[in-house]
Amino acid sequence: MSAEFEELSAIDFLLFMDNVDSLDLIRSEYYIIEQNRKICEVFDDEPDNKGCRQLLHRFLCCMKRYPRADFIDSYDAYDRQQKYICISDPKAENYDKFWELAWCREVNTIVKISQTKEEESCQYWSSREESEIECGGFRIKTLMVIKRPRFIATLLLLSDQKNREREIWHYHYTASPTDNNPDDPFIFLSFVCSLNDTFTISKKKQLAEWKPGAVLVHCNDGSSFSAVYCILDICVTQFKYTGALSVANAFRKITQRKHNCLNYDADDYSFCYQAIHMYVLGELGLSQKYLDERELTR
């Protein structure tokens, strides 16, 4: 039930995607993973499984600490050094808890995946340079704003009650559909790759003992795009390091917890495969569209 799926080289992955039955195979793979996950949940519910109850207790304690967050969960990135923290969009009355979470979890990157127009979305930071807001004892100053075709990058300075400071990069994905237009895996992939490249470059500039902070991901579509973002980022990172990848294993990594609160379905899983297909084609130089898009978002 817990066996991992085979990691595929670029060529093997492309051969799989070229199979006329690939879409059916992908959806079948999704249902197999989900079935195994549910079987594991039943096993974990057995009376003798005290470890699971302890995990649940810790989870509930965490929820009590941040009572207004719809959900909180963390997932290892590919290299096990970085953490993804997935939450729902914070509400105006919840901004202090949001920044408390960011401070306590040592977040250095926030990824906001909006499905609504900018003026309708949550604004827990200022979009104007040199401006500052306060939220429950935390001060958030906007140092720099960089506008890209698909997203807006903002460098924030977060200060706590003791005047300790920490820089946080905030990335707001702005290419999401607003009028019931279909999501484009290619556009979202470009956004993921841009952030992944930024992290890779930053990591190379740091000292050997440096450890990255957590990445806080939130969206307002019921959290499915938070799951998609994490899966794609894991696959891209794995391919960079090993030349191979497994969408199935990345998906299992973020859904294997019994009490994970990410919402997703077979369509989201297929979306990930479509995006990674475009990524592999581009990395092999077989897609000029991919190369042009990457140049646009650098």
Predicted regions and their residues:
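Cys-based phosphatases of the PTP/DUSP/CDC25 superfamily and their flanking regulatory architecture
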Residues: 1-298
